[in-house]
From Swiss-Prot:
Active site: C152
Family named by the database record: Belongs to the glyceraldehyde-3-phosphate dehydrogenase family.
GO molecular function, one term: NADP binding
Annotated localization: Cytoplasm
Name listed for the protein in its UniProt record: Glyceraldehyde-3-phosphate dehydrogenase
Catalysis performed (reactions): D-glyceraldehyde 3-phosphate + phosphate + NAD(+) = (2R)-3-phospho-glyceroyl phosphate + NADH + H(+)
Job description of the protein: Catalyzes the oxidative phosphorylation of glyceraldehyde 3-phosphate (G3P) to 1,3-bisphosphoglycerate (BPG) using the cofactor NAD. The first reaction step involves the formation of a hemiacetal intermediate between G3P and a cysteine residue, and this hemiacetal intermediate is then oxidized to a thioester, with concomitant reduction of NAD to NADH. The reduced NADH is then exchanged with the second NAD, and the thioester is attacked by a nucleophilic inorganic phosphate to produce BPG.
EC number assigned by the record: 1.2.1.12
Key words of the record: Cytoplasm, Glycolysis, NAD, Nucleotide-binding, Oxidoreductase
Site-annotated residues for Activates thiol group during catalysis: H179
Extra information: Binds human plasminogen.
Pathway: Carbohydrate degradation; glycolysis; pyruvate from D-glyceraldehyde 3-phosphate: step 1/5
Domain of life: Bacteria
Length: 336
């Protein structure tokens, strides 16, 4: 059975999700909704500065574009309630606009001619299940209509924090994400549409302190860590490729080797492990949601207790997208 997917919002995440889905048997995108002209959407799908050229053919046609010989309908509806997903057989929508990230808003896709399920590509709040694949996807039972795929940083932090907590018990922690600049920052100094004075400064020329909800949102993914972590972000002048540092106190004293062994044992398709001396450009395009860097593990003795630092890399674009598509595929498979 082929699962038919619709994408609402064909920006960075929407386009990269489309690319990923092209390589998955049994899943296909049959409709895209975006207010941008299809000629522009097709061009941005074909050419990508950070992720490279699309491996396939893209041709603009009346009403959409043809990708590898398959026609994809493109509509331009502002209100999800007006998108006729059903005509194209869409069962599940990837909500990637950023404007319908809360449950009530995302549910607008579930109208009479709409879809059956929605995956939000952003933190969704306390009233939807927040899923980081291979960390807590087993909380889904298939009856849900709207779920959240969390944020890119939460997808990096969660598997590392879970492995650490399962092995040694986290008491408290602070995380910092050193994060690539994104489209919500100015390329040159100028007024920021959200009124943020720091994001109004040139993103490719500054280290820009920013907030992140990833640490606090960890409680939605790993309930036993609720209230135990906090954190912040520093946006840096790279177009993609980010890293998360987590400093914690643990229930027991440990060594660097013990920590690294626990992380290696916890590795899977979503949580990678490396001992190579890599830099940020080396993780562009990786499909791990989080790539643990064993070379950066630190343990400091402090008056009989310890401070422990662990580090994991992520491509804030492709790592996150790969996780979203894993979640979407699983969600469709168990749907009831």
């Amino acid at each position: 059975m082929v699962v038919k997917v619709g994408i609402n919002g064909f920006g960075r995440i929407g386009r990269l999700a489309f690319r990923r889905i092209q390589n998955i048997e049994g899943v296909e995108v049959t409709r895209i909704n975006d207010l941008t002209d299809p000629n522009m959407l097709a061009h941005l799908l074909k050419y990508d500065t950070t992720q490279g050229r699309f491996d396939g053919t893209v041709e603009v046609k009346e009403g959409g574009f043809e990708v590898n010989g398959n026609f994809i309908k493109v509509s331009a509806e502002r209100d999800p309630e007006n998108i006729d997903w059903a005509t194209d057989g869409v069962e599940i929508v990837l909500e990637a606009t950023g404007f319908f990230a809360k449950k009530e808003a995302a549910e607008k896709h579930l109208h009479t001619n709409g879809a059956k399920k929605v995956v939000i590509t952003a933190p969704g709040g306390n009233d939807v299940k927040t899923v980081v694949f291979n960390t807590n996807h087993d909380i889904l039972d298939g009856t849900e209509t709207v779920i959240s795929g969390a944020s890119c940083t939460t997808n990096c932090l969660a598997p590392m924090a879970k492995a650490l907590h399962d092995a040694f018990g986290i008491q408290k922690g602070l995380m910092t994400t050193i994060h690539a600049y994104t489209g919500d920052q100015m390329i040159l100094d100028g007024p920021h549409r959200g009124g943020d004075l720091r994001r109004a400064r040139a993103g490719a020329a500054n280290i820009v302190p920013n907030s992140t909800g990833a640490a606090k949102a960890i409680g939605l993914v790993i309930p036993e860590l609720n209230g135990k972590l906090d954190g912040a972000a520093q946006r840096v002048p790279v177009p993609t490729g980010s890293v998360t540092e987590l400093v914690v106190t643990l229930d027991k004293n440990v060594s660097v080797d013990e920590i690294n062994a626990a992380m290696k044992a916890a590795s899977n398709d979503s949580f990678g492990y490396t001992e190579d001396p890599i830099v940020s450009s080396d993780i562009v395009g990786v499909s791990y949601g989080s790539l643990f860097d064993a070379t950066q593990t630190k343990v400091m003795e402090v008056d009989g207790s310890q401070l422990v630092k662990v580090v994991s890399w992520y491509d804030n674009e492709m790592s996150y997208t790969a996780q979203l598509v894993r979640t979407l595929e699983y969600f469709a498979k168990i749907a009831k």
